[in-house]
């Protein structure tokens, strides 16, 4: 073999080790702040590349969506099965001001609620809040035994399901239309709407495990910095938000 064709021989002593640069030296940390609707406002930290030339770090941060467990935001394990999405809307120094972007249930919680000998009822509505946020809200409910019932099953008839679904849709539409996004979030945390649905449908068929299982943000109004700052407090320096009063779930008879 010719020497000129052998890459190992022709390389010589040129191959020096390249200087290894830590990629984290080009990045910086930002603190994520939740709205004052939640009790704990410190969500966590996020990384972003430092501002270089015309490329600004804040442009990469705005619109970023983070998913947080509601138990961490409220400091209570009672909300461990619910996930909240927060969207970064504004950058103030090293703080990222977020707004509510959606809510969902964990998969294990949804699977654990489905049992035999009962009927699953689902309903969803697309409605606009009083401050022009368009939301799609999904509700879920399960039938339970009536008082002094001997029969093992608690299946609802199709007519009952239609009536219950209609009542759920009416309550969800009314509650959302008469509330701002912040007010609606305050209702979703202690599950006030769930109890209202359960009481409104008890004459049709008794229900259990009534939940708003998902809230999806479809459309948002034009960004208003003033409303965002008021949502976080004027100075946005408080580490604690206002506490939302909750309640204890009633112990229902298992089926």
UniProtKB/Swiss-Prot annotation:
Keyword Hydrolase (UniProt): no
Molecular functions (GO terms): structural constituent of ribosome
Cellular-component GO terms for this entry: cytosolic small ribosomal subunit
UniProt-listed GO biological process terms: translation
Modified residues (N-acetylalanine): 2
One family name in Pfam for this protein: Ribosomal_S3Ae
Record field: transmembrane: none
PROSITE patterns: RIBOSOMAL_S3AE
Entry keywords, A to Z: Acetylation, Cytoplasm, Ribonucleoprotein, Ribosomal protein
Annotated compartments: Cytoplasm
HAMAP family cross-referenced by the UniProt entry: Ribosomal_eS1_euk
PANTHER family: 40S RIBOSOMAL PROTEIN S3A (PTHR11830)
Description of how the protein assembles with itself and partners: Component of the small ribosomal subunit. Mature ribosomes consist of a small (40S) and a large (60S) subunit. The 40S subunit contains about 33 different proteins and 1 molecule of RNA (18S). The 60S subunit contains about 49 different proteins and 3 molecules of RNA (25S, 5.8S and 5S).
UniProt similarity note: Belongs to the eukaryotic ribosomal protein eS1 family.
Name of the protein this chain belongs to: Small ribosomal subunit protein eS1
Natural source organism: Kluyveromyces lactis (strain ATCC 8585 / CBS 2359 / DSM 70799 / NBRC 1267 / NRRL Y-1140 / WM37)
Organism lineage string: Eukaryota, Fungi, Dikarya, Ascomycota, Saccharomycotina
Name of the encoding gene: RPS1
